């Protein structure tokens, strides 16, 4: 029997009785956000909306984005990254489990000095991929051009936020590069590794 999304009691200020809300809504009220799936337009838009709402509600309290993601679509991921840079509160990024592909890009986008990985977390970077099956030659050429632009954008962000030279990041993005939490810290993707 699946348990679904757990519900927890929550009492709004000024109310006598607590109401039961799903755990994620309760945690959102504490400014704790979760990316626990592949990045797509739906989850990206939900997180963007939450970040903007919470920023408007109080732009002095930091946001905390917990990441356990296998990656996903580039454009929704870049939109989420851009929002993290746009909102006034600092966005802490915390990798638990894995932050692969677009997940690692969002992880590196946290406020510098406020990016953390749990001790057994895994991080993976690589170049963006396209879907070339059943594409006409003209469309293929356009898609390759767009992919090259996206790759350059992602590479420059990694360079800026990790402090690694362009040639190192470019070379590493040629293939899947997996890292432990301490290796991700040495690379500059995270600033701290949580202690066990």
Swiss-Prot record:
Chief location category: plastid
State the protein's name.
Answer: ATP-dependent Clp protease proteolytic subunit
Family to which this protein belongs: Belongs to the peptidase S14 family.
Q: Which PROSITE patterns match?
A: CLP_PROTEASE_HIS, CLP_PROTEASE_SER
Show the active-site residues.
101, 126
Keywords in alphabetical order: Chloroplast, Hydrolase, Plastid, Protease, Serine protease
State the Gene Ontology BP annotations: proteolysis
Q: What organism, scientifically named, is this protein from? A: Lactuca sativa (Garden lettuce)
Q: Which gene encodes it?
A: clpP
Q: Which domain of life is it from?
A: Eukaryota
- Name the Enzyme Commission number(s) assigned to this protein: 3.4.21.92
The protein's job, in short, is: Cleaves peptides in various proteins in a process that requires ATP hydrolysis. Has a chymotrypsin-like activity. Plays a major role in the degradation of misfolded proteins.
What does the record give under GO molecular function? ATP-dependent peptidase activity; serine-type endopeptidase activity
- Sorted alphabetically, which InterPro entries does this protein's record hold? ClpP, ClpP/crotonase-like_dom_sf, ClpP/TepA, ClpP_His_AS, ClpP_Ser_AS
Sorted alphabetically, which Pfam families does this protein's record hold?
CLP_protease
């Amino acid at each position: 029997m699946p348990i679904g999304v757990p519900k927890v009691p929550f009492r709004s200020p000024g109310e006598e009785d607590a109401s039961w809300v799903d755990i994620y809504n309760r945690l959102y009220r504490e400014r704790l956000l979760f990316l626990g799936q592949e990045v797509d337009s739906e989850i990206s838009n939900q997180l963007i909306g939450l970040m903007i709402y919470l920023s408007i509600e109080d732009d002095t309290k930091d946001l905390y984005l917990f990441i356990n993601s296998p990656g996903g679509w580039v454009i929704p991921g870049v939109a989420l990254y851009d929002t993290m840079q746009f909102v006034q509160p600092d966005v802490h990024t915390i990798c638990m489990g894995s932050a692969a592909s677009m997940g690692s890009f969002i992880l590196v986008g946290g406020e510098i000095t406020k990016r953390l990985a749990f001790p057994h977390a895994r991080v993976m970077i690589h170049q963006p991929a396209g879907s070339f099956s059943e594409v006409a030659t003209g469309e293929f050429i356009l898609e390759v051009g767009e992919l090259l632009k996206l790759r350059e954008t992602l590479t420059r962000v990694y360079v800026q936020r990790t402090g690694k030279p362009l040639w190192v990041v470019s070379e590493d993005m040629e293939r899947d590069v997996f890292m432990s939490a301490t290796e991700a810290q040495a690379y500059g993707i995270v600033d701290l590794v949580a202690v066990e």
